[in-house]
A protein has these predicted regions:
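Bacterial N-terminal signal peptides that target proteins for export
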Residues: 2-15
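N-terminal periplasmic/intermembrane-space "pro-region" immediately following the signal or transit peptide
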Residues: 2-3, 19, 23, 27-105
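Outer membrane beta-barrel
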Residues: 81-235, 262-280, 350-356, 360-379
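Extracellular/periplasm-exposed beta-strand and loop segments of Gram-negative cell-envelope proteins
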Residues: 184-186, 196-204, 209, 239-242, ...
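Short Gly/Pro-enriched turn/cap motifs at secondary-structure boundaries
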Residues: 201-205, 258-261, 295-296, 306, ...
Length: 436
């Protein structure tokens, strides 16, 4: 492209103007030949000056239009291809699970009820590659108020720090590593509308304590957990309430709500996953539980053994757990005459089998059956003739039903439960649950 000369136009205009003025002046006056010659010489000199300025201006513009010399040739870049870049995990992750259930007793249909059993929101935030915080907030039965049966509770709130690839430290409020259900209690993680009785009446799921915990994970499939935590509070035992008969430990756990911490507990758990599809494990918890409020010290101990095997389409699971409370004779003496005394021992056992009958893409139909045996007051300490309560009758429950999964995160459930002792409790259950 020919370079433009933005400054040349004013110079030409000046020359034209000068000539016009000169000619006009010559026509307006009678000039002598000498005067005319002088004016022509002056105009010639001015014209030469303007030409020199124009040449100088053109040279400047040409130099400006030339590219600057490169110090070194730049390497030719390869064509940019839209490669798929791995997406980094977000630092903060929202989690949730929930259960909406319907229960209809077979002998008293008028007592059927529907309930938002649980709604939980949580988040995990990773501060760096080694440290994160885990929290969950739970609402039970939809509404919590002075006139409603609902409850709002913090289910988890702890910091986890990865000391090395095999060892992690947790501090705060965390779930106890007991049984199969307590740490994995989302509705998509268990069969049936309701959680099994063994891991709710004997193991008080969802059971959490505040403290510190070490978690070791090894290449041979072994995971070890252990630590120091808060304990139960036997001073919360209400001998006039039926809560202790429903779940002895569930009625006296503190959930770290202004928890009395004079007495603490130790716990340990081991789980082995060395063979694909097989889990073998066990746990033990033991700690004083009178919190310096009673003359007699009392220790609560709970242990369990559990296994799960998932060969092909099958899914088998079993848990046995047993709990004991020491020195209950001294604790029960002032409670004699009330309906619910403190049991010396309690235990439970279940076996369960499920089968993936049909699946297509994300859909799956899984019928299952579960048989349970549990006793929340298997024995009492001797209080003397006529004062010692009789052991409770061992309850046996069979649950038959099916889970229909829309995906790994959404499940519809239906089942029937039959009780051997409390036959009035026989019922049909429907439910829907989710987790992410």
């Amino acid at each position: 492209m020919t370079p433009s000369h933005p400054r040349a136009l004013p110079a030409r205009s000046l020359l034209a103007t000068a000539l016009a003025l000169a000619l006009g002046s010559a026509q307006a006056q009678t000039a002598t030949e000498a005067e005319l010659a002088r004016k022509l010489d002056q105009l010639a000199s001015e014209l030469a000056t303007v030409k020199a300025q124009l040449v100088q201006l053109q040279q400047q513009q040409q130099r400006a239009a030339q590219p600057a010399p490169a110090a070194a040739p730049a390497p030719v870049a390869a064509p940019v291809v839209a490669a798929e870049v791995p997406r980094a995990e977000p630092a903060t992750v929202l989690t949730s699970y929930g259960e909406i259930n319907y229960n209809r007793p077979t002998k008293a249909g008028q007592n059927a009820q529907a309930d938002i059993r649980r709604f939980v929101l949580g988040y995990q935030h990773r501060f760096d590659d080694k440290t994160k915080v885990v929290t969950e907030l739970e609402v039970e039965h939809a509404v919590a108020s002075a006139s409603d049966a609902g409850e709002v509770a913090i289910e988890q709130a702890f910091i986890e720090h990865q000391i090395n690839p095999s060892l992690a430290l947790r501090a705060g409020l965390f779930l106890m590593p007991v049984g199969l259900l307590n740490e994995n209690h989302e509705p998509t993680a268990f069969y049936g509308v309701e959680r099994n009785f063994v891991e709710t009446a004997i193991i008080p799921s969802t059971w959490r304590e505040g403290g510190i915990q070490l978690v070791g994970s090894f290449d041979n499939g072994l995971t070890l957990q252990g630590g120091l935590t808060t304990s139960f509070d036997l001073n919360k035992w209400d001998a006039k309430s039926a809560d202790g008969r429903k779940s002895p430990l569930g009625s006296i756990h503190q959930e770290m709500a202004l928890a009395k911490a004079h007495d603490v507990a130790l716990f340990g758990a081991a789980n082995w996953r060395g063979i694909p599809g097989l889990l073998l494990g066990g746990s033990v918890f033991s700690g004083q539980a009178t919190q310096a409020q009673a003359v007699t010290q009392s220790r609560i101990t709970l242990w369990d053994l559990h296994a799960r095997w998932t060969p092909g389409r099958w899914d088998f699971a079993t848990v046995y757990t047993r709990g004991s409370i020491s020195n209950t004779a001294a604790l029960n003496t002032p409670l004699v005459g009330n309906d619910t005394l403190i049991p010396k021992s309690f235990d439970g056992f279940y076996v369960q089998g499920a089968y993936r009958l049909w699946s297509s893409e994300d859909y799956a139909l899984l019928p299952f059956v579960r048989w349970e045996r549990f006793n929340t007051a298997k024995s009492y300490a001797d209080l003397g003739a006529g004062l010692t309560p009789e052991a409770a009758r061992t309850e046996r429950v069979i649950t038959v039903g099916a889970d229909f999964r829309l995906s790994q995160n959404i499940v519809f459930k239906a089942d029937y439960q039959r009780f051997r002792e409390a036959t009035d409790a026989n019922r049909y259950n429907l439910g829907v649950g989710w987790s992410f």
